[in-house]
Design a protein with these regions (language model features):
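Hydrophobic alpha-helical transmembrane segments
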Residues: 85-91, 296-317, 378
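Hydrophobic alpha-helical segments of polytopic membrane proteins
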Residues: 93, 111-118, 170-234, 246
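Hydrophobic, glycine- and aromatic-enriched re-entrant/interface helices and adjoining loop segments
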Residues: 131, 135-137, 219-306, 324-332
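Membrane-helix boundary/helix-loop-helix interface segments in multi-pass membrane proteins
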Residues: 2-49, 55-191, 348-363, 367-377, ...
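Alpha-helical transmembrane segments of multi-pass membrane proteins, especially transporters
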Residues: 148, 173-177, 200, 221, ...
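Interfacial segments of multi-pass membrane proteins
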Residues: 162, 198-217, 278-302, 359-373
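Loop-to-helix entry and N-terminal half of a specific, functionally important transmembrane alpha helix
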Residues: 321-359, 365
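Transmembrane alpha-helix boundary/anchor motif
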Residues: 93, 101, 157, 230, ...
Length: 414
């Protein structure tokens, strides 16, 4: 019997509709394409670093939990460890989800996020929550630190602005990018957040140099940077006290000196997990000074492994960009890895008492909520922007040749 045309077709038991089957095949195909194009080496290195962070937070959690417990509220020794697992789970989902986005979507999303977090940064001094003398968080049911989520969006937006130069060399891209950087740094210093301001300036400097700036301008930029550091020293008491303490040498009661002593206490092989004692006197053992906890409990050899993993991540991104043919991709990935690498090595230098204290976490290792999600977002953007078909050959991007071609094309039109 032929079914009526007015009745919907109902498949028999065990029969699949071709549309549903195609949809499943499309999803599988997209996953296969993603897995083929993604930088799997970078993904494995990041997951390795996060695994090290999981163990390190477990080691540091008892010290911080006991330090922050009160007579009214007693925190479980592994309180921060269990919270960290939740943040890591959300972070990995964020990283993988963002890494699947097409490059254009990743760029547009980052620009929108940059605008939204800039608004949040403007609101922080007025409605933000104050912690340890600084207003950095917005609280509306959850705590959000706009400066953390702004970092990856800022790097991509800055790369997008500087890449305009290829389309029209006459555009004042350096001035536009510099104005954005100055605006953000000014908002950060109002909190104040000197450590994040250094990262934003460093990211801007890396991208401006890579964009092919005239060498004659570098001296002027360096001079402006020196003036900015001097003004910060003179105008901000917190920054001046930290720099003076660093230059004057630590004392037994200085937290940076305590961090260095804790780091060295474990020797080459460490005292063993949960067997360290110096970490108990460290403030923020699970965040700012987790590298020192790693040194005390697991030894300097494991500290060296952590440093090598960071170097491997940086090297992998740079190798991936060697034959890249798109200026925007080169700049955005360079800016993102500059943020992660810069934050990592500032934190490590602080723990070694080679840099003034900045209140900065160790990326992908330290405990954190906003910082963990934001760093996983950073890696996700990096993975999305550097995706490529491994079977296609690529020509290395030449900025000078691109600018010369643009000039020739304009000359021909005139």
């Amino acid at each position: 019997m032929t079914p009526s045309l007015s009745q919907p077709y109902v498949p028999h038991v065990g029969e699949r509709s071709s549309q549903a089957s195609r949809r499943r095949l499309d999803k599988r195909s997209q996953l296969r394409i993603w897995w083929r194009e993604i930088d799997r080496v970078l993904l494995v290195l990041v997951l390795l670093l996060m695994a090290i962070g999981t163990v390190a937070v477990a080691a540091a959690s008892p010290a911080s939990a006991r330090r922050l417990s009160t007579s009214a509220v007693k925190l479980d020794d592994l309180y921060f460890y269990w919270l960290h697992l939740r943040w890591q789970f959300l972070g990995i989902l964020t990283m993988l989800g963002v890494s699947m986005a097409p490059k254009d979507w990743a760029r547009r999303g980052a620009i929108v996020l940059c605008a939204a977090m800039l608004i949040g940064l403007v609101l922080v001094p007025f409605v933000g929550s104050e912690v340890n003398g600084a207003k950095r968080w917005l609280r509306f049911g959850i705590s959000l630190q706009p400066s953390e989520f702004l970092k990856p969006a800022y790097a991509v937006t800055m790369a997008w602005i500087l890449s305009w130069r290829v389309r029209d060399p006459r555009l004042p891209v350096i001035a536009i990018a510099s104005s954005l950087m100055v605006l953000i740094v000014g908002l950060l210093m109002a909190q104040p957040d000197f450590g994040s301001a250094i990262l934003y300036v460093g990211c801007w400097a890396v991208l401006v140099l890579l964009s092919g700036i005239d060498m004659r301008r570098i001296g002027a930029l360096m001079g402006a940077g020196i003036v900015g550091i001097g003004a910060t020293y003179l105008l901000y008491d917190n920054a001046r006290h930290r720099i003076d303490a660093f230059l004057g040498g630590g004392t037994a009661y200085d937290q940076v000196d305590l961090a260095r002593r804790t780091l060295m206490a474990g020797g080459w092989t460490g005292s063993g997990m949960w067997l360290g004692t110096r970490k108990l006197s460290l403030p923020e053992a699970h965040t700012d000074y987790i590298f020192s906890v790693i040194g005390e409990e697991f030894g300097l050899l494991i500290c060296a492994v952590v440093v090598l993993v960071y170097l491997a991540i940086i090297a992998r991104v740079l190798v991936r960009l060697v034959n890249e043919e798109d200026l925007f991709t080169i700049l955005s990935a360079s800016g993102l890895i500059a943020l992660i690498g810069g934050q990592a090595f500032i934190n490590i230098l602080v723990n070694l008492q080679l840099f003034p204290s900045k209140g900065m976490t160790l990326p992908l290792v330290s405990y954190g909520g906003s910082s963990t999600i934001a760093l996983c977002l950073t890696v996700g953007l990096m993975l999305a922007l550097t995706r490529r078909n491994p079977y296609l050959s690529r020509d290395r991007f030449d900025l000078m040749a691109a600018l010369a071609k643009e000039d020739r094309d304009k000359g021909g039109r005139h």
